[in-house]
Amino acid sequence: MEEQIEPIDRVFVQLGPIAIYWYAVLILLGVAVGYFMARRESVKRGLPQETFADLLVWALPISILSARAYYVIFRWEQFADNPISVFYLREGGIAIHGALIGAVVTAIVFAKKRGLSFWKLADVAAPSILIGQAIGRWGNFVNQEVYGAEVTREFLEGMFLPDWIINQMYINGTYYQPTFLYESLWNVLGVVVLLLLRKANLRQGELFLSYVIWYSVGRFVIEGMRLDYLLIGDSLRTAQLLSIILVVAAIALWVYRRLWVKPPRYLNPDAATKQRK
């Protein structure tokens, strides 16, 4: 007989006719935690206190739009019969890579207009981005998405997971691997690594490039476990291809900047407005 396990209610709170969903709450929580981390570090690095608040005003909506656009482009068959569903964000369906593209483009334009170094902003933000991603993945958990292969309950219990996680991995009569959790934990570990690298006083830009490499390696591996993924054509997983490109590009940029640009050190108090390119 099939087990009867009720999933977590996707609605965080109902305010009259307005429903606020866990998905949105957890994404905004990740943004808030990341913002306060970046704000605290930016002041230490000699940036104006309002820098990241001003950046967030533009980066947040643009990132959400680009994340949704990225997802829709690679999953158009899901929306073709009902195009208005493109705007149903409460049901999930945004791509982190799309959000990062939007955020980076916004930060480049913002830095240029403010006379700041993009690389300095990116270095300050790197651990904050990862912690935001780690928290945001729990929105996928509530929505019962970003999961891996079929497993047994015994398999999940063997991972010493609490029942509330195991039960949420019970989807349409089957238990699945919690790949959302793997990525969330990988990102938390990445935050620790980046905070340690911050003390190593790398060259400007190298902390952000470390983030790109760390996240991309983890995403490549975990993407191979997922059952819900975006494809280019019939078999090429979009996130894995982009992860390879990002790792190669980050390493190439690291070498190029170290050998020819020779940017200042991250902890150099005068570096905030230098090396704008």
Swiss-Prot record:
Membrane topology qualifier: Multi-pass membrane protein
GO cellular component: plasma membrane
The keyword Cell membrane is annotated on this UniProt entry: yes
Domain of life of the organism encoding this protein: Bacteria
Biochemical pathway: Protein modification; lipoprotein biosynthesis (diacylglyceryl transfer)
Molecular function in Gene Ontology: phosphatidylglycerol-prolipoprotein diacylglyceryl transferase activity
Disulfide bond residue pairs: none
Primary location group: membrane
GO terms, biological process: lipoprotein biosynthetic process
Claim: Hydrolase is one of the keywords in the record: no
Membrane spanning residue stretches: 18-38, 54-74, 91-111, 115-135, 177-197, 205-225, 236-256
Subcellular location: Cell membrane
Binding site for a 1,2-diacyl-sn-glycero-3-phospho-(1'-sn-glycerol): 137
Keywords in alphabetical order: Cell membrane, Membrane, Transferase, Transmembrane, Transmembrane helix
Class of this enzyme: transferase
E.C. designation(s): 2.5.1.145
Family statement drawn from the similarity comment of this UniProt entry: Belongs to the Lgt family.
Function field: Catalyzes the transfer of the diacylglyceryl group from phosphatidylglycerol to the sulfhydryl group of the N-terminal cysteine of a prolipoprotein, the first step in the formation of mature lipoproteins.
This protein's name: Phosphatidylglycerol--prolipoprotein diacylglyceryl transferase
